[in-house]
């Protein structure tokens, strides 16, 4: 069970509740459930990008490339992080962006959803919606985010 009182109390000194984690970690599912329990709006950054560009993330990667996607992801994410009292689910690679990372850590309550790599692989292996799941240059056993002070 989610301790809504504890999260609300923690959020009083913070702007938003932000969920981080690798692809398939449950950021969108958990974020949506917690937003409902807290009676707050939920923002899924991947869905926001698809809505703004009118196409799927898979198609964006295919037609415009990852660099285009990452720049647009940064723009949308930084804009949404300026809102107050919302629950936000970031894209799986968003936290590798130094501007997004800085803003998330500045005035937001954030949770990193961490799972065993076998669980993550099982969650994403049959998904057609994950454009870089198996084209990545790193493996799930070797985290793509290696930052001092942020164990992954």
List the model feature ranges, each with a label.
Residues 107-149:
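A glycine- and Lys/Arg-enriched "phosphate-lid" helix/loop adjacent to the NTP-binding pocket
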Residues 22:
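P-loop (Walker A) phosphate-binding loop of NTP-binding proteins
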Residues 25:
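ATP-binding Walker
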Residues 28:
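Walker A/P-loop
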Residues 41, 45-105, 130:
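ATP-dependent small-molecule kinase phosphotransfer cores
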Residues 19:
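Hydrophobic anchor at the beta1->P-loop junction of P-loop NTPases
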